[in-house]
């Protein structure tokens, strides 16, 4: 009986150590899993700034380097959101007209091939979602106000961006450049929906519109960086 009780005690001790060993193994696996997840998150946190730097910051640096000496002469600025804004209406079109001025044509002749070269560079081409050519007018339309003025300006802004696209397509571009332009460029007329103040900022409630600065043409880049970041996070 003593031998039986002794063997039983040994068996219980063995079961205890086996159970303890299983718990330790499970804890080790749990810590290993946590470590792997943490490493993945750290890797993702490195990838996201890299994606941003290579795309948005890279485009900003290239555009600034390429055009910084020309922007002032063109009556243009490069915004932080990668928008190039041509803001001197007397250079762009005659009042109420959608015909490109000779001076604006000369600017586009110089600007656009260089701009397109940057967008189609292998560093950026797969990260460009679309490029919008936005046409904006002021809210002014002679003695006409309200809805009719808005609709007249809508028609004018749309016609102007359409004429810009038409002119760009007739530049000396190769077939690859033309096809890429047609797939990625959009011409949008905003009428007077986005007027600017004296500081060339979006008009806020209670501010006075600057009728001159509100009239502009913008080349606005939209990247797919958001989609790429979502892909990284969802992995």
Regions of interest found by a model, annotated:
Residues 136-224:
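Periplasmic OmpA-like peptidoglycan-binding domain that tethers envelope proteins to the cell wall
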Residues 52-90, 95, 104, 228, ...:
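Helical coiled-coil/dimerization "stalks"
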Residues 80-109, 140-153:
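Short, solvent-exposed beta-strand/turn patches at coil↔beta or beta↔helix junctions
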Residues 80-89, 96, 127-129, 183, ...:
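Envelope-exposed proteins and targeting segments
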Residues 64, 97-133, 165-171, 219, ...:
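Periplasmic peptidoglycan-binding/anchoring modules of Gram-negative envelope and division proteins
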Residues 51-55, 96-107, 152-160, 209-211:
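Extracytoplasmic/periplasmic, Sec-exported soluble proteins
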Residues 68-80, 124-132, 181:
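Short beta-strand elements
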Residues 1-75:
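Short terminal targeting/anchoring segments
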């Amino acid at each position: 009986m003593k031998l039986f009780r002794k063997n039983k005690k040994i068996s219980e001790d063995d079961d205890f150590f086996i159970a303890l060993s299983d718990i330790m193994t499970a804890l080790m696996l749990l810590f290993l899993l946590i470590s792997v997840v943490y490493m993945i998150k750290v890797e993702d946190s490195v990838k996201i700034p890299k994606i941003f730097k290579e795309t948005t910051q890279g485009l900003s640096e290239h555009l600034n380097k390429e055009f910084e000496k020309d922007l002032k002469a063109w009556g243009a600025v490069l915004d932080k959101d990668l928008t190039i804004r041509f803001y001197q209406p007397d250079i762009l079109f005659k009042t109420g007209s959608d015909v490109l001025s000779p001076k604006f044509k000369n600017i586009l002749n110089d600007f656009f091939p260089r701009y397109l070269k940057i967008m189609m560079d292998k560093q950026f081409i797969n990260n460009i979602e679309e490029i919008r050519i936005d046409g904006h007018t002021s809210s002014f339309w002679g003695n006409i106000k309200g809805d009719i003025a808005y609709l007249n300006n809508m028609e004018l802004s749309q016609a102007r961006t359409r004429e810009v696209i038409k002119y760009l397509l007739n530049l000396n571009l190769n077939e690859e450049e033309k096809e890429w332009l047609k797939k990625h460029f959009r011409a949008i007329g905003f009428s007077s929906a986005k007027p600017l103040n004296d500081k060339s900022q979006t008009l806020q409630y209670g501010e006075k519109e600057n009728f001159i600065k509100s009239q502009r043409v913008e080349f606005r880049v939209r990247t797919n960086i958001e989609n790429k970041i979502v892909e990284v996070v969802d992995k």
